[in-house]
């Protein structure tokens, strides 16, 4: 793919390669589904409140294509969190906005996609009858917003649309700066507390709060205290870690934004520190950031995490899922 981009004098762009791979993966899953069907070993189930995860491995919130998510569930993920949805239609940032990087000899991805999505109204219509429910595993509905009011409006619509479903949790994504003013609920603990408490008045669904590794420890600690004050909640620690194109080793002509979020093994140490912090507060934790091996899983488990979110690893080698499951 990069060869043809260079041949045509176009900027290097990973996104067409990912889309091409997704289409062929989906086609292969229809032709030979047995390739992707793996049993989840017994006795690795995790219970979180009233949710049962047959495997503690979960798909992080970065995909919305049902056929790809279904493949990962067939391979043994215990849950999937859908890509963050916002109130209105979003086209995302200009391309190129996705690049492969090499950090300390390990593959990763630099991403500034910008939360493209159809908007909450179309999303709720699609998710109501999605075939993903047929797997019987908890689905995470990730919610973004430019204000506390937008979060609450989106939550209300989701609760109404999914009134006949009970195997899901809500995730408040307060870790992504793709907002109109660049601020998130992480910048205002009082507003976060208001959103959580008003959400709890609307529903008893489990609520996750997804935090950023770019936040300072005092901020994370404050968020942890706020989340802990609301019943039936857990922390998702965390998300991608911001790097400029220079820091990530990407040429400026090959990226439309000044920087983006790095994912992959390079961000694992920071995520591990976050897990330790929230474990000391006493919160249930989903660890997300750089997990790709059984050693990673054991490390975050030892620090107190009970669920393990995966993203880049699913793109680079989805067969790591059954491999890790077999060693849990």
Task: Identify the residue ranges that each predicted region occupies.
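Glycine/Thr-rich beta-alpha phosphate-binding loop at enzyme active sites
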Residues: 26-38, 174-187, 220-283, 321-326
């Amino acid at each position: 793919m990069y060869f043809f981009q260079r041949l045509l004098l176009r900027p290097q762009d990973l996104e067409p390669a990912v889309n091409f791979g997704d289409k062929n993966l989906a086609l292969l899953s229809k032709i030979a589904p047995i390739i992707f069907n793996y049993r989840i070993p017994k006795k690795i189930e995790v219970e979180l409140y009233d949710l049962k995860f047959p495997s503690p491995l979960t798909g992080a919130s970065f995909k919305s294509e049902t056929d790809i998510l279904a493949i990962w569930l067939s391979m043994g993920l215990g849950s999937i969190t859908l890509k963050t949805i916002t109130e209105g239609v979003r086209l995302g940032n200009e391309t190129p906005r996705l690049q492969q990087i090499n950090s300390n000899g390990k593959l990763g991805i630099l991403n500034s996609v910008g939360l493209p999505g159809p908007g909450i109204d179309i999303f709720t219509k699609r998710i109501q009858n999605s075939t993903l429910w047929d797997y019987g595993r908890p689905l995470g509905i990730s919610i973004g917003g430019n204000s506390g009011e937008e979060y609450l409006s989106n939550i209300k619509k989701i609760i109404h649309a999914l009134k006949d479903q009970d195997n899901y949790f809500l995730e408040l994504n307060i870790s992504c700066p793709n907002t109109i003013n660049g601020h998130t609920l992480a910048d205002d603990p009082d507003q976060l507390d208001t959103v959580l408490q008003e959400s709890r008045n609307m529903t008893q669904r489990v609520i996750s709060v997804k935090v950023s590794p770019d936040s300072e420890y005092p901020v994370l600690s404050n968020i942890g205290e706020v989340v802990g004050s609301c019943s039936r909640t857990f922390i998702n620690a965390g998300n991608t870690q911001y790097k400029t194109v220079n820091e990530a080793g990407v040429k400026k002509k090959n990226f439309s934004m000044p920087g983006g979020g790095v994912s992959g093994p390079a961000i694992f140490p920071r995520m591990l520190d976050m897990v330790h912090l929230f474990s000391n507060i006493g919160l249930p934790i989903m660890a997300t950031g750089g997990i790709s091996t059984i050693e990673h899983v054991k490390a975050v488990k030892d620090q107190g995490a009970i669920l393990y979110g995966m993203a880049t690893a699913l793109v680079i080698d989805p067969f790591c899922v059954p491999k890790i499951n077999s060693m849990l």
